[in-house]
């Protein structure tokens, strides 16, 4: 079950700006609707999109700082995650817990986002995203921690 409320739809760091003058946040590139509604959507989806950006940073992808290898029938993946995003994810999980939000739901949706967007990207990045989504989904279902 979702948590419905005002939502963004493409909530990741590249779509969040902070003004210098009064430190307000501006959100860019709002999704036009969620299943036909322009006023409400699933907040868990926005939280999952934010977590997606903490794990896979577009600047790191643009610098080719991710890897995928197949050895003896097993797939291994890795991506460089800047220290600030690692800390951000720790605070994010604490914030979820403090606000009685489900980390499990956020992790499941994040893994589904990776699986869903994989087909939209070039090789080998698409294979990296697919395997990341698959590994994260399996770990989430089995209640295992997911580390990078």
Residue ranges of each PLM-predicted region?
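Active-site acidic catalytic loop and adjacent metal/ATP-binding pocket
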Residues: 1-41
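Short, surface-exposed alpha-helical recognition segments that flank or form part
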Residues: 2, 80-83, 106
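Intrinsically disordered or highly flexible coil/loop and linker segments, enriched in small
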Residues: 16-17, 60, 146
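Regulatory N- and C-terminal appendages and interdomain linkers associated
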Residues: 22-25, 101-148
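Active-site activation/catalytic loop segments of kinase-like enzymes and analogous catalytic loops
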Residues: 24, 33-94, 111-125
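Acidic, serine/threonine- and proline-rich low-complexity regulatory regions
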Residues: 36, 96-105
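Hydrophobic, Leu/Ile/Phe/Ala-enriched alpha-helical segments that form helix-helix packing faces
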Residues: 54, 58, 92-100, 137-144
């Amino acid at each position: 079950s979702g948590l419905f409320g005002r939502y963004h739809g493409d909530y990741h760091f590249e779509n969040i700006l902070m003004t210098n003058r009064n430190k307000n946040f501006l959100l860019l590139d709002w999704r036009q609707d969620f299943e036909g509604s322009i006023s409400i959507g699933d907040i868990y989806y926005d939280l999952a999109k934010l977590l997606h950006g903490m794990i896979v940073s577009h600047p790191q992808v643009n610098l080719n700082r991710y890897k995928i290898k197949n050895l003896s029938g097993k797939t291994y993946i890795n991506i460089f995650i800047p220290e600030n995003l690692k800390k951000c994810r720790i605070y994010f999980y604490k914030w979820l817990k403090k606000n009685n939000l489900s980390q499990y739901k956020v992790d499941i949706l994040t893994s589904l986002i990776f699986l869903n967007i994989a087909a939209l990207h070039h090789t080998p990045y698409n294979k990296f995203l697919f395997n990341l989504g698959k590994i994260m989904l399996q770990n989430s279902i089995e209640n295992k921690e997911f580390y990078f």
